[in-house]
């Protein structure tokens, strides 16, 4: 699931993913966060 959060590194996405999908799992792709539910 892509969320509307800009990123430069995957670690920036973990707190955002935790807030969005309840799980701190994801990575930075093309400058945006992708979360794994």
From Swiss-Prot:
Residue numbers spanned by region Interaction with Ca(2+)-activated K(+) channels: 26-33
Residues marked Aromatic residue of the functional dyad (site): 36
UniProt-listed Pfam families: Toxin_2
InterPro entries linked to this entry: Scorpion_toxin-like_sf, Scorpion_toxinS_K_inh
Cystine bridges: 7-28, 13-33, 17-35
Function: Reversible blocker of both Shaker B potassium channels (high affinity), and Kv1.3/KCNA3 potassium channels of human T lymphocytes (low affinity).
Subcellular location: Secreted
UniProt comment concerning the protein's domains: Has the structural arrangement of an alpha-helix connected to antiparallel beta-sheets by disulfide bonds (CS-alpha/beta).
Family indicated by similarity: Belongs to the short scorpion toxin superfamily. Potassium channel inhibitor family. Alpha-KTx 04 subfamily.
Protein name: Potassium channel toxin alpha-KTx 4.4
Domain of life: Eukaryota
Recorded GO CC terms: extracellular region
Record-level Gene Ontology MF annotations: potassium channel inhibitor activity; toxin activity
Tissue expression from the record: Expressed by the venom gland.
Any single GO BP term: envenomation resulting in negative regulation of voltage-gated potassium channel activity in another organism
Site entry: Basic residue of the functional dyad: 27
